[in-house]
């Protein structure tokens, strides 16, 4: 059996909007949109990894709220797990610091106006269902 490496993604929500991040690197992912996040380090809880990754990538203080049902395979040995998250009071506004060049808050009706990374689409669909919007 192969060990899997968990990648955490944040469905960062604010006033019914979802934060999407446009990749700037690596070149094969640049220009596509994703849920921000990253790899869980050995010995780290996924929720702690999510908080750390959001601070590193977006400069924010956020907290995981609830795990989104599902687990989505990425390039082996990685697997994506997603949590809803929110900004903590007093947090700075998100800004692209690492691996991204643009951020966008998407309302439910605009969720599919950006070209999501294929690997993130199933997770975004699940988040969309939780927001009460039509899946695509």
What do the PLM-derived regions correspond to, one by one?
Residues 55, 61, 130-132:
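HhH-family (HhH-GPD) DNA N-glycosylase catalytic core used in base-excision repair
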Residues 61-62, 70-94, 102-108, 120, ...:
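Active-site-adjacent beta-strand/loop module that shapes the phosphate/pyrophosphate-binding cleft
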Residues 119-136:
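Charged phosphate-binding loop/patch that engages nucleotide di/tri-phosphates or the phosphate backbone
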């Amino acid at each position: 059996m192969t060990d899997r490496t968990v990648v955490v993604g944040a469905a960062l929500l604010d006033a019914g909007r979802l934060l999407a991040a446009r990749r700037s690197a690596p070149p094969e992912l640049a220009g596509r949109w994703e849920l921000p996040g990253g790899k869980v380090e050995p010995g780290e809880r996924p929720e702690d990894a999510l908080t750390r990754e959001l601070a590193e990538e977006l400069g924010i203080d956020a907290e995981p709220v609830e795990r989104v049902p599902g687990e989505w395979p990425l390039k082996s040995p990685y697997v994506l797990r997603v949590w809803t998250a929110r900004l903590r009071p007093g947090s700075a506004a998100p800004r692209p610091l690492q691996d991204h060049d643009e951020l966008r808050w998407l309302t439910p009706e605009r969720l599919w106006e950006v070209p999501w990374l294929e690997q993130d689409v199933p997770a975004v669909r699940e988040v969309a269902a939780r927001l009460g919007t039509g899946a695509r």
